Amino acid sequence: MSKVLPSNLASALISFALLPSLQRLFPATATRPAAHLVGTPGSGKSEIASLLSSFYGEFSRDTPPAQWADTINTVETLGCPLADAIFWVDDYKSIYADERTFTRFLQAYSRGMGCGRLTRESKVRHEKPCRGLILSTGETTIEGEMSIIARMLVLEIPP
């Protein structure tokens, strides 16, 4: 494992990978963190994410469960059934989600809420909050309001 995980980040990465199994023991009022692995192409971000996700099932670097190119609604819905697992969302780029949309999603995620929506009849739709613990990868750092950055563990993966 030492050849895959950078030695200076290994303890943080493994701790984050095991956090979903302890998540139910935390009070409901605790905010839910997310981790973002940032690095250059070929630095091993997806390999690390698939390795950490493999604590919860079979994953490969080429088949992430979700991508930031998906709509935020899709990301939220795919993460809903993953209450006690890592939810790997690959390849963050600022062109995929504007800052306002991403900020709204991450704030709702950290509170365990869904992004509120209405039906065609203007009735409140049943929320499907993302319950998986988000492990994000990308070549750029996620930027936004300070409240978003405070909710994320941003780890730079060396080339």
For every predicted segment, state its role.
Residues 1-5, 63-75, 117-122:
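Active-site-adjacent structural elements in folded domains
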Residues 1-62:
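P-loop NTPase catalytic core of nucleic-acid-dependent motor ATPases
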Residues 43, 47-100:
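AAA+/P-loop NTPase substrate/partner-engagement loops
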Residues 143-159:
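Conserved P-loop NTPase catalytic core
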Residues 115-116, 129-139, 154-156:
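Structural recognition of the conserved hydrophobic beta-strand(s) that form the central parallel beta-sheet
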Residues 102-121:
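Conserved catalytic/switch belt of AAA+ P-loop NTPases
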Residues 94-95, 140-142:
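Residues immediately C-terminal
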Residues 78-81, 98, 125-130, 144-148:
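Conserved catalytic network of the ASCE P-loop NTPase/AAA+ motor domain
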